[in-house]
């Protein structure tokens, strides 16, 4: 028997960030990273949409690239103090990954990080909150996956947490959020998406459900990544879709040795290195 899991709702297309105003709840905590969403005005838009939905909103800002165990614990503590019924994570892979782990510690304060490092060993989530993810880069696809990557810097180990429980309930894949991406970031996140799709296609767990997604993503990356790199906005929108398709594929077919090697090697270099190494 095999399992195929995706978010309940995936909204895509320019301007779909507005779907936040249709979420049903009382309190939302919005988890973001280093400030690009604030500078570009998307953070304010998201806050206003959530308030339009009738929710009280609290921010948790400053999630670093390659988020640490310490950041996860701080975020979970903030969630326990605020009591949200929606966790909304917006940004690159780091704030979304961090928020997924925060979610587990928010709902289960007594669980240990070591417990969560055991693949597919998460407790049943959604006891207190649901999860919405909004990517601002076109590579990680964590908005549709059952994975979260958290780093224990004291041990020098990057841990991939894996459980279908942390697949978001809602993914908002708004291409407007990636229009201002620097060309270099377009390139390395695009190669990350390509690697996700290829690894899913050659995975020993690939199947008739994952192969079409992987193949479509591969074709789209070849068709649109060069133009996206040069600043073509239609190509950039298509790359945002392609990376999401790749995520749907690899979340269910899983990945292989390429990502295993990248997680180890990138600790020696910059936060960008993992995506670049994935595509080598």
Per-range role (PLM):
Residues 147-253:
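Carboxylate- and glycine-rich phosphate/diphosphate-binding segment that chelates Mg2+/Mn2+
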Residues 70-77, 81-173:
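Glycine/threonine-rich beta-strand-loop-alpha-helix active-site module
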Residues 269-276:
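Conserved small/polar residues in nucleotide/adenosyl-binding loops
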Residues 1-86:
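ATP/NTP phosphate-donor binding region
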Residues 64, 90-92, 254-257:
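Active-site nucleophile and cofactor-binding loops and adjacent substrate-binding regions
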């Amino acid at each position: 028997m095999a399992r195929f899991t995706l978010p309940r709702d995936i909204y895509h297309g320019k301007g779909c960030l507005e779907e936040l105003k249709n979420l049903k709840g009382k309190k939302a905590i919005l988890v973001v990273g280093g400030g690009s969403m604030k500078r570009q005005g998307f953070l304010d838009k998201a806050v206003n949409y959530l308030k339009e939905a009738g929710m009280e909103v609290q921010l948790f800002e400053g999630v670093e690239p390659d988020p640490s165990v310490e950041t996860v614990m701080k975020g979970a503590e903030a969630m326990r103090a605020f009591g949200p019924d929606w966790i909304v994570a917006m940004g690159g892979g780091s704030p979304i990954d961090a928020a997924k782990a925060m979610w587990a510690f928010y709902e289960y304060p007594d669980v240990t990080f070591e417990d969560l490092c055991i693949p597919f060993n998460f407790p049943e989530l959604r006891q207190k909150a649901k999860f919405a993810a909004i990517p601002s880069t076109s590579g990680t696809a964590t908005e549709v996956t059952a994975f979260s990557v958290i780093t224990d810097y004291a041990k020098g180990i990057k841990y991939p947490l894996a459980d279908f429980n942390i697949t978001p309930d809602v993914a908002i894949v708004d291409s407007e959020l990636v229009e201002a991406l620097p060309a270099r970031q377009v390139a390395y996140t695009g190669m990350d998406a390509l690697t996700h799709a290829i690894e899913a296609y050659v995975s020993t767990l690939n199947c008739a459900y994952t192969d079409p997604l992987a193949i479509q993503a591969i074709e789209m990356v070849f068709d649109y990544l060069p133009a996206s790199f040069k600043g073509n906005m239609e190509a950039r929108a298509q790359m945002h879709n392609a990376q999401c398709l790749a995520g749907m594929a690899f979340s269910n077919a899983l990945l292989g040795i390429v990502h295993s090697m990248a997680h180890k090697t990138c600790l020696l270099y910059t936060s960008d290195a993992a995506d670049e190494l994935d595509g080598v």
